[in-house]
Amino acid sequence: MLRLTNKRREEASVKRALTLENEIELIEGCRAGKDSARKELYTLYSKQMLAVCYRYTGDVDAAHDVLHDGFIKIFTHFAFRGECALSTWVTRVMVTQAIDYLRKQQRFSQLVVNEE
């Protein structure tokens, strides 16, 4: 029998509780810059998005950097237009952030090779 820890139970209940009405409130709160909405968004998606970032970077530290940069981008430029699910949009932001990170790493490694 699978037993969930209290933290996992809490996360599962938060995810189940994200109905369309709650999602709209969360989106509006993030647009308004409310810290409580930002915290809820981070709590809902950070673990899943860390896995996405890790799949692209292959490095735990880099994945954490990409995750944090992605959430900073989301919180400073909340450009969600409602054309897809919020989770899809957050994933897209993280994937784009991971690809940008990899491009910068590639440019940096080329600079180091060229200088030698």
Q: Which stretches of residues belong to each language-model region?
A:
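Short, structured helix-loop boundary elements
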Residues: 24-27, 35-39, 60, 64, ...
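Arg/Lys-rich amphipathic alpha helix in sigma70-family domain 2
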Residues: 81, 92-113
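Intrinsic, short, N-terminal disordered tails of RNA polymerase sigma-factor systems
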Residues: 1-28, 40, 116
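Conserved RNAP core-binding helix
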Residues: 26, 42, 50, 60-77
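Sigma70-family region 2
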Residues: 31-32, 68-86, 104-106
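Structural recognition of an alpha-helix C-terminal capping motif at a helix-to-coil junction
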Residues: 51, 65-72, 84-96
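A short, charge-rich alpha-helical start-of-domain segment used by transcription regulators
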Residues: 27-51
